[in-house]
Amino acid sequence: MENAGQDLVACLFQREDTLQDAAAVLSLSVADVTEAERMLRAFVNTAPADEGRKTPRITFCYTVNKAYLVYRLPQTTLFKQLTSFVEPTLDVYAAFYGGRLLLAPDEDSLSHYIRQLDKGEVLNGAMAYQTGMDHLSDSYHFMLMADFDHVFRQSENHVRFVPDFFLRNADFFRNFTLFVQFACTDGVVYPNIF
């Protein structure tokens, strides 16, 4: 953890094939990417072999601009513990992108996320995102942005944390994007909802 940065972002997003479950990625800032990648590669290369698995521990995610190394970590419940919004899996895939360590429960989620970033298909600049962000503080400890229509279409595993009030009135709320932000000052938590 000596190379970990100060922030962690969890992303849940729709795959191109909308019949599949949502994709999930954790993005952790990294202070020294070169050292962190060296340590991760050493960890992956010295981990015990997985019985009966033929998939390589290190593969590539190819984009138009670059090939990114993708590491299959030894099986663990880490991703599930950190997010609690994915189907149970023991797999965790990792890659470095733009000074961040990306973690995902499957290689497809990770590759899709990297390709979207590489193409510049991000929320910054999108009108709905910018409108919501204009009403929030620049300083916060936690922020959530959710398109209720997409949230309500997810499996029960993904919507179990949505308050009953929103679920009972889903026909109304599916037309909204929710922005929630929490800031902590002097031990007091201040919510900001837009």
Please report, for each region that a protein language model flagged, where it lies by residue.
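Signature of soluble extracytoplasmic/periplasmic domains of secreted precursors
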Residues: 1-194
